[in-house]
Amino acid sequence: MIELIPAIDIIDGKCVRLSQGDYGSKKVYNENPVEVAKEFEANGIRRLHVVDLDGAASHHVVNYRTLDLIASRTSLIIDFGGGLKSDEDLIIAFENGAQMVTGGSIAVRNPDLFCRWIDRYGSGKIILGADVKDRRIAVNGWKVESTCELFPFLKDYTQKGIEKVICTDISCDGMLAGPSLDLYKEILAEHPTLYLIASGGVSSIADIEALHEAGVPAVIFGKALYEGRITLKELQAFL
């Protein structure tokens, strides 16, 4: 069964969502992310994706207190991303309750450091973030398109021990227009043992069903839930 991973994106300690990574499109859904996380847990959710959008913009962890509150008041398994650029950032994330961390920009900008993290913490705790725009990896909160092509990037890091990848098609993220199903099928055809976490574009329970039928191991979703396109009750079929 596909693993369900709701997302809580944080700006100024509040639960927000963006469209295509545009900070100008910010919409606040809840002033208290802890209450959101507790509601998820009460409905059978076991895993949570927390993104520090302030951290992504400022290149260091910012909303670690919110992470700590969610971790201390729920039993959710949390993966945390956004602005992780140093050993200190990772220590802050893990000390404040993250069980896993996601590195995207750092894997492009400083691959030696990212590989040290894989070696030090293990592939169970380090997730590769592959944020894609026109099949190139985007960095710095999706504001900059790098020269890294998606498939060589994935091949390189799977050879270096990465087992889990969050792949976000930026053109789909927050648009409620459906996920990049063909892209995910292509990735799994090339990397059949990869724990691929699809992210971006999920607009309905049918999208989750389609990803499940395509063999995608896990899915991250946010706006569809916050906008009422998907209900927590509907998700029970996958739990």
UniProtKB/Swiss-Prot annotation:
The keyword Amino-acid biosynthesis applies. One of its GO terms (biological process) is L-histidine biosynthetic process. One of its GO terms (cellular component) is cytoplasm. Its EC number is 5.3.1.16. The active site is at 9 (proton acceptor), 131 (proton donor). It comes from the Bacteria. SUPFAM superfamilies: Ribulose-phoshate binding barrel. One of its GO terms (molecular function) is 1-(5-phosphoribosyl)-5-[(5-phosphoribosylamino)methylideneamino]imidazole-4-carboxamide isomerase activity. It catalyses: 1-(5-phospho-beta-D-ribosyl)-5-[(5-phospho-beta-D-ribosylamino)methylideneamino]imidazole-4-carboxamide = 5-[(5-phospho-1-deoxy-D-ribulos-1-ylimino)methylamino]-1-(5-phospho-beta-D-ribosyl)imidazole-4-carboxamide. Pathway: Amino-acid biosynthesis; L-histidine biosynthesis; L-histidine from 5-phospho-alpha-D-ribose 1-diphosphate: step 4/9. InterPro entries: Aldolase_TIM, His_biosynth, HisA_bact_arch, Isoase_HisA-like, Isoase_HisA-like_bact, RibuloseP-bd_barrel. It is an enzyme of class 5 (isomerase). The keyword Oxidoreductase does not apply. Its main location: cytoplasm. It is found in: Cytoplasm. PANTHER family: 1-(5-PHOSPHORIBOSYL)-5-[(5-PHOSPHORIBOSYLAMINO)METHYLIDENEAMINO] IMIDAZOLE-4-CARBOXAMIDE ISOMERASE (PTHR43090:SF2). HAMAP family: HisA (MF_01014). Belongs to the HisA/HisF family. This is 1-(5-phosphoribosyl)-5-[(5-phosphoribosylamino)methylideneamino] imidazole-4-carboxamide isomerase. It comes from Bacteroides fragilis (strain YCH46). The gene is hisA.
